C-alpha cells in the first residue's frame, strides 16, 4: 500500500482542521478550477459560492482549461476573467468536503464562523479504463477519471 500525506506542512495542529476525499468521480480539470475559486475564502463564503454554482446562478472562472469555452455574464465584474463554466458535479463533492472539515473543526472545538481555507489542493486520481465495442470488431476507449482533494482550514481571529 502506498503512503499518503498532506502536501501542506502543518505547524500548529491545535487551530487547524483538515479533511481529504479520495477517488472523487470528477475530472481533475473541473476539480482544479473549482478548488482554485474557493482557495483563501472563509468556509461560509465558499459554501455559498458552491451552492450558487449548483443552482447555476454563478459561474466559476476557468483559467487554465479554457479552450473553446464561452464567456459568462457576471464573471468579469467579480473575477476579472470572462471565461467560465458551472462545474456542478465538482461543486457537489466540494460542498460535502467542506461539511466534513467543518465537522472536524467542531470536534476540535474551533469556531465554525472563523474558519478560513488556508490550503486546498486537487490531485489526479485513478483512471478507470473501459472499452466500448464499435463496428467491425473495433473498440473505443472510455476513460473515467477521478480526483483526490485535500483541505486544511484554520481558525482566525
Swiss-Prot record:
Gene Ontology CC terms: cytosolic large ribosomal subunit
InterPro entries, sorted: Ribosomal_uL22, Ribosomal_uL22_CS, Ribosomal_uL22_euk/arc, Ribosomal_uL22_sf
Pfam family, one: Ribosomal_L22
Keywords of the record: Ribonucleoprotein, Ribosomal protein, RNA-binding, rRNA-binding
Ribonucleoprotein keyword on record: yes
Keyword Ion transport applies: no
Stored SUPFAM superfamilies: Ribosomal protein L22 (SSF54843)
Domain of life: Archaea
Spans traversing the lipid bilayer: none
HAMAP family: Ribosomal_uL22_A
Function: This protein binds specifically to 23S rRNA. It makes multiple contacts with different domains of the 23S rRNA in the assembled 50S subunit and ribosome.
Name of the protein: Large ribosomal subunit protein uL22
Protein source organism: Staphylothermus marinus (strain ATCC 43588 / DSM 3639 / JCM 9404 / F1)
Upper taxonomic lineage: Archaea, Thermoproteota, Thermoprotei, Desulfurococcales, Desulfurococcaceae
